[in-house]
Amino acid sequence: MGIQFETDYNMETLTAMAKGLRKTVRKKRSRRVHIFAAVVLILGLLTILATTAGGEPPGASGVVTLLALLVLILATVFEDRLNAWFARKRLLPGTEHAAATFEEDGYVSATGVTESRFSYAQIVAVAETARYFVFALSSHHTQAYDKRTIRGGSVEDFRAFIAEKTGKLVENIQ
């Protein structure tokens, strides 16, 4: 009997998972996307300023540009929640709750529909938020474990255990 977790995959959990991916395995891509968004934002603002410099109100194209910039800002600010929303839409029925048990040779995650066994070698990165441990299995797949439900050990014990088993540093993300 190893360390156990029970996790509900709700919007908060899915948002933490999206953030975990963005801050670990997608870090470089995320940085590029944010730089691209900033450049587009600056160019859009310069375009609006150039068209309104003569004292004329912005036309239809200026309003459309402004709305596009607003959508860009909102998508960038709320990207983790947006990704969580899409993930929730793709969540299979019966997988909203998972129970996981961590042993020496691997771990088992059970949902209402299936039970899956994983080896620690499958974990690409480990992140920790205030409430969750997030495992990145690829650039598109994660698992989250709610620290409030831990049994069979402490959070500190699990942090040391998973770092040893994966050979990966547990990244603290806020």
Task: Set out the residue ranges of the language-model regions.
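Residue-level recognition of conserved beta-strand positions in structured domain cores
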Residues: 17, 111, 136-138
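N-terminal membrane-targeting/pre-transmembrane regions
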Residues: 1-50
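Phosphoinositide-dependent membrane-docking surfaces
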Residues: 107, 116-133
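Conserved beta-hairpin
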Residues: 75-117
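A membrane-cytosol interface segment of integral membrane proteins
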Residues: 132-174
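Hydrophobic alpha-helical transmembrane segments
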Residues: 55-70
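Short, surface-exposed beta-strand-loop junctions and turns on beta-sheet-rich folds
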Residues: 115-117, 124-126, 140-143, 151
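Generic beta-strand structural signal
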Residues: 101-102, 128, 137
